[in-house]
Amino acid sequence: MTYLKLTGSRQGLISAKCSTSESIGNRFQTGHEDEIQELTLNHNISRSQNLSHHPVQFIKPIDMSSPLLGVSISSNEQLEAIFTCYRTNQNGRLELYYKLKLTKASIVDISSTYTNVTNSNGIIPHEKILLNYESISWEHITAGTSGYSIMENNIF
Protein backbone atom coordinates (compact mmCIF):
# COMPACT_ATOMS: atom_id res chain seq x y z
CA MET A 1 0.00 0.00 0.00
CA THR A 2 1.20 3.49 -0.82
CA TYR A 3 -0.18 6.72 0.61
CA LEU A 4 0.42 10.42 -0.05
CA LYS A 5 0.39 13.28 2.42
CA LEU A 6 0.02 16.40 0.27
CA THR A 7 0.36 19.93 1.65
CA GLY A 8 -0.15 23.08 -0.40
CA SER A 9 1.28 26.54 0.25
CA ARG A 10 -2.21 28.06 -0.11
CA GLN A 11 -4.68 25.27 0.67
CA GLY A 12 -2.87 23.59 3.55
CA LEU A 13 -3.35 19.83 4.00
CA ILE A 14 -4.91 18.84 0.67
CA SER A 15 -4.98 15.18 1.70
CA ALA A 16 -7.11 15.87 4.82
CA LYS A 17 -9.87 13.24 5.23
CA CYS A 18 -9.11 11.67 1.82
CA SER A 19 -9.06 8.09 3.12
CA THR A 20 -12.40 8.30 4.93
CA SER A 21 -15.60 6.50 3.93
CA GLU A 22 -17.14 9.86 2.88
CA SER A 23 -14.29 10.37 0.42
CA ILE A 24 -13.63 6.89 -1.01
CA GLY A 25 -16.41 4.65 0.28
CA ASN A 26 -15.48 1.15 1.40
CA ARG A 27 -11.83 1.59 0.34
CA PHE A 28 -11.17 3.73 3.46
CA GLN A 29 -8.27 2.79 5.75
CA THR A 30 -8.27 3.46 9.48
CA GLY A 31 -5.08 5.22 10.53
CA HIS A 32 -4.55 6.83 7.11
CA GLU A 33 -7.52 9.21 7.07
CA ASP A 34 -5.43 12.28 6.16
CA GLU A 35 -3.58 10.61 3.30
CA ILE A 36 -4.44 9.92 -0.33
CA GLN A 37 -4.46 6.26 -1.37
CA GLU A 38 -2.22 5.56 -4.33
CA LEU A 39 -3.01 2.95 -6.95
CA THR A 40 0.40 3.37 -8.62
CA LEU A 41 3.49 5.53 -8.12
CA ASN A 42 6.10 5.95 -10.88
CA HIS A 43 9.31 7.95 -10.97
CA ASN A 44 12.15 8.21 -13.45
CA ILE A 45 15.58 9.85 -13.35
CA SER A 46 17.84 9.45 -16.37
CA ARG A 47 21.25 10.58 -17.54
CA SER A 48 22.79 10.93 -20.97
CA GLN A 49 25.09 13.85 -20.23
CA ASN A 50 23.27 15.76 -17.51
CA LEU A 51 20.92 14.29 -14.96
CA SER A 52 17.29 14.58 -15.99
CA HIS A 53 14.50 14.50 -13.40
CA HIS A 54 11.17 13.49 -14.91
CA PRO A 55 7.82 14.26 -13.27
CA VAL A 56 6.64 11.88 -10.57
CA GLN A 57 3.45 10.21 -11.74
CA PHE A 58 0.82 8.71 -9.49
CA ILE A 59 -2.64 7.32 -10.04
CA LYS A 60 -5.24 7.75 -7.31
CA PRO A 61 -8.95 7.15 -6.89
CA ILE A 62 -11.28 10.10 -7.44
CA ASP A 63 -11.67 11.41 -3.87
CA MET A 64 -12.28 14.62 -1.99
CA SER A 65 -8.83 15.95 -2.98
CA SER A 66 -9.73 15.84 -6.69
CA PRO A 67 -11.32 19.33 -6.83
CA LEU A 68 -8.49 20.72 -4.67
CA LEU A 69 -5.90 19.33 -7.10
CA GLY A 70 -7.71 21.22 -9.87
CA VAL A 71 -7.38 24.41 -7.84
CA SER A 72 -3.71 23.63 -7.20
CA ILE A 73 -2.78 23.21 -10.88
CA SER A 74 -4.84 26.30 -11.81
CA SER A 75 -2.95 28.49 -9.34
CA ASN A 76 0.46 26.79 -9.77
CA GLU A 77 0.45 26.13 -6.01
CA GLN A 78 3.72 25.00 -4.44
CA LEU A 79 3.39 21.60 -2.77
CA GLU A 80 5.17 19.25 -0.43
CA ALA A 81 4.45 15.59 -1.19
CA ILE A 82 5.38 12.71 1.10
CA PHE A 83 4.71 9.21 -0.28
CA THR A 84 4.83 6.38 2.27
CA CYS A 85 5.04 2.72 1.26
CA TYR A 86 3.86 -0.14 3.44
CA ARG A 87 4.44 -3.88 3.16
CA THR A 88 3.51 -6.95 5.17
CA ASN A 89 6.22 -7.84 7.71
CA GLN A 90 7.18 -11.28 9.07
CA ASN A 91 4.44 -11.01 11.70
CA GLY A 92 1.74 -10.40 9.09
CA ARG A 93 1.33 -6.72 9.95
CA LEU A 94 1.75 -3.70 7.73
CA GLU A 95 4.99 -1.81 8.30
CA LEU A 96 6.19 1.50 6.91
CA TYR A 97 9.36 0.65 5.02
CA TYR A 98 9.97 3.34 2.39
CA LYS A 99 9.41 7.08 2.05
CA LEU A 100 9.76 9.42 -0.95
CA LYS A 101 9.57 13.18 -0.37
CA LEU A 102 9.22 15.97 -2.95
CA THR A 103 9.82 19.59 -2.03
CA LYS A 104 8.79 22.67 -3.99
CA ALA A 105 6.62 20.49 -6.19
CA SER A 106 3.84 21.58 -8.52
CA ILE A 107 1.21 19.75 -10.54
CA VAL A 108 1.94 19.81 -14.28
CA ASP A 109 -0.77 17.43 -15.51
CA ILE A 110 -4.06 15.93 -14.34
CA SER A 111 -5.81 13.27 -16.41
CA SER A 112 -9.10 11.88 -15.10
CA THR A 113 -10.82 8.62 -16.07
CA TYR A 114 -14.46 8.18 -15.11
CA THR A 115 -15.35 4.54 -15.65
CA ASN A 116 -18.81 3.07 -16.05
CA VAL A 117 -19.33 1.20 -12.80
CA THR A 118 -21.61 -1.42 -14.38
CA ASN A 119 -19.11 -2.67 -16.96
CA SER A 120 -15.67 -1.47 -15.86
CA ASN A 121 -14.24 -4.87 -14.80
CA GLY A 122 -13.28 -3.55 -11.37
CA ILE A 123 -11.59 -0.38 -12.64
CA ILE A 124 -12.61 2.53 -10.44
CA PRO A 125 -12.82 6.21 -11.43
CA HIS A 126 -9.29 7.55 -11.03
CA GLU A 127 -6.90 10.30 -12.02
CA LYS A 128 -3.27 10.42 -13.08
CA ILE A 129 -1.27 13.30 -11.58
CA LEU A 130 2.22 14.44 -12.65
CA LEU A 131 4.38 16.48 -10.28
CA ASN A 132 7.52 18.46 -11.08
CA TYR A 133 9.74 19.23 -8.10
CA GLU A 134 12.90 21.00 -6.98
CA SER A 135 14.25 18.22 -4.79
CA ILE A 136 13.55 14.60 -4.03
CA SER A 137 14.65 12.41 -1.15
CA TRP A 138 14.38 8.68 -0.64
CA GLU A 139 14.51 6.79 2.64
CA HIS A 140 14.45 3.02 3.12
CA ILE A 141 13.35 3.06 6.73
CA THR A 142 13.82 -0.60 7.64
CA ALA A 143 17.24 -0.88 5.94
CA GLY A 144 18.48 2.50 7.20
CA THR A 145 19.55 3.97 3.84
CA SER A 146 18.67 7.36 2.37
CA GLY A 147 19.59 9.76 -0.41
CA TYR A 148 18.48 12.93 -2.15
CA SER A 149 18.83 14.87 -5.38
CA ILE A 150 18.39 18.58 -6.07
CA MET A 151 17.61 19.50 -9.66
CA GLU A 152 19.84 22.61 -9.77
CA ASN A 153 22.91 20.72 -8.51
CA ASN A 154 23.00 18.11 -11.26
CA ILE A 155 24.55 19.82 -14.27
CA PHE A 156 28.01 18.45 -15.02
Q: Which residue ranges define each predicted feature?
A:
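Glycine-rich, low-complexity intrinsically disordered segments
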Residues: M1-F156
